[in-house]
Amino acid sequence: MIFEKIKDLIATQLSLDTSTITLDTRFKEDLGLDSLDALELVMEAEKTFQINISDATLQNFKTVQDIVFYITKNTS
C-alpha cells in the first residue's frame, strides 16, 4: 500500500507511468530527480502519511525502497 502511494506521488510529480517505477528505481540516476523535485516529493509524502522527514533523512533516500522502508518503519 505504501509503495503504491509513493509510486503514484512520483508518477504524478514527474508525469511518468507508474509501471516504470519499482522499489529499485533510483531517484537521481533513473528518474533524474533533482533536489527541488526530491523536496516536493518528500513534502507530499509527509502530507500523505502524516510524518516528518528531516533534511538529513531525505539525503539518505537513494531508491524508492528507501523511502518506502522509512515510511513503513515510522508509521503504525
Swiss-Prot record:
Listed pathway(s): Lipid metabolism; fatty acid biosynthesis
Gene3D superfamilies hit by this protein: ACP-like (1.10.1200.10)
Primary location: cytoplasm
A Pfam match: PP-binding
Keyword Lipid biosynthesis: yes
Cellular compartments per GO CC: cytosol; membrane
Family matches, as InterPro entries: ACP, ACP-like_sf, PP-bd_ACP, Ppantetheine_attach_site
Assigned keywords, A-Z: Cytoplasm, Fatty acid biosynthesis, Fatty acid metabolism, Lipid biosynthesis, Lipid metabolism, Phosphopantetheine, Phosphoprotein
SUPFAM superfamilies (UniProt xref): ACP-like
Carrier domain residues: 1-75
GO molecular function: acyl binding; acyl carrier activity
Subcellular location per the Swiss-Prot or TrEMBL entry: Cytoplasm
Entry PTM: 4'-phosphopantetheine is transferred from CoA to a specific serine of apo-ACP by AcpS. This modification is essential for activity because fatty acids are bound in thioester linkage to the sulfhydryl of the prosthetic group.
Highest taxon of source: Bacteria
Residue numbers bearing the O-(pantetheine 4'-phosphoryl)serine modification: S35
GO BP terms: lipid A biosynthetic process
Function in brief: Carrier of the growing fatty acid chain in fatty acid biosynthesis.
Similarity annotation: Belongs to the acyl carrier protein (ACP) family.
Protein name, as recorded: Acyl carrier protein
Organism whose genome encodes this protein: Aster yellows witches'-broom phytoplasma (strain AYWB)
Native organism taxonomy: Bacteria, Bacillati, Mycoplasmatota, Mollicutes, Acholeplasmatales
